[in-house]
């Protein structure tokens, strides 16, 4: 979450008149994250989250993930629900941006994920994948393998400002990924951004998944790969195989990975690292002046990518090919 677009109090109060969520008492911007403008609202009826969708979310895509949240919730997946205005719409316009209000989920995201957190997200992700199998809408992933080179082209001329040799490193890896990306693995609805700050816990118990704007239809195991990179590295960027084992075993208790998915997981993890390396690189080089946002370090994902390049197989993640503990 972040704030790119400021909202005046009187403008917000007028916007909220279309909703039955009470009168506005206070609001504040949420600085965490990098993608959209988010505000915590305090009204006479409680707390809500207001999101203004920015650069990477098209207005035409909003119905996909707003309906998805309702679909998942009806099948037992804990996630926020959008508020409907008096016209029966879940999406309005505020400050020239598509705007949505969702209910506030209790819990906090884990700053230092432990084994219980990793197992919790693995289990919840698998349940989400199963619950999404009958979701009728379809949205391709604009940030999958075909979307990476256009991102690289935006930042290539300045990549070496971040680290000498980074441009050639990315170019070579892109060539490899584009030439080897799998196209026969099981697909379905994925979250595509299931980082710790998008998963809430109360203690060690998972209380909900949030932030669905990148949800789409893609390779299910790619979502798992994203989580391996996001949850299983320590602050010094060493890989914690015990956390990976906890995540993968919990996932597979709900949805077993096929042999082909298991064999492809290191490649998918390389691709997942490339995706976030590139979006971070573009964002790092193009933060709007005065934006209440903390750009994330692209070099974190350079190091994660280098690690994944040396993974020989799923055993390096702490599990046997059949899914048993190594």
Swiss-Prot record:
Keywords, ordered alphabetically: Amino-acid biosynthesis, ATP-binding, Kinase, Nucleotide-binding, Threonine biosynthesis, Transferase
Coiled-coil spans in chain: none
InterPro entries, sorted: Aminoglycoside_PTrfase (IPR002575), Homoserine_kinase_II (IPR005280), Kinase-like_dom_sf (IPR011009), Pseudomonas-type_ThrB (IPR050249)
Gene3D superfamilies, per the entry: 3.90.1200.10, Phosphorylase Kinase, domain 1 (3.30.200.20)
Gene Ontology terms: biological process: threonine biosynthetic process
Molecular function (Gene Ontology), one example: homoserine kinase activity
Pathway: Amino-acid biosynthesis; L-threonine biosynthesis; L-threonine from L-aspartate: step 4/5
The protein's Enzyme Commission number: 2.7.1.39
Catalyzed chemical reaction(s): L-homoserine + ATP = O-phospho-L-homoserine + ADP + H(+)
Superkingdom as given in the UniProt entry: Bacteria
Enzyme's top EC category: transferase
SUPFAM superfamilies given in the database record: Protein kinase-like (PK-like)
Annotated Pfam families: APH (PF01636)
Classification via PANTHER family: AMINOGLYCOSIDE PHOSPHOTRANSFERASE DOMAIN-CONTAINING PROTEIN (PTHR21064:SF6), AMINOGLYCOSIDE PHOSPHOTRANSFERASE DOMAIN-CONTAINING PROTEIN-RELATED (PTHR21064)
Family, similarity comment: Belongs to the pseudomonas-type ThrB family.
UniProt name for this protein: Homoserine kinase
Lineage: Bacteria, Pseudomonadati, Pseudomonadota, Alphaproteobacteria, Hyphomicrobiales
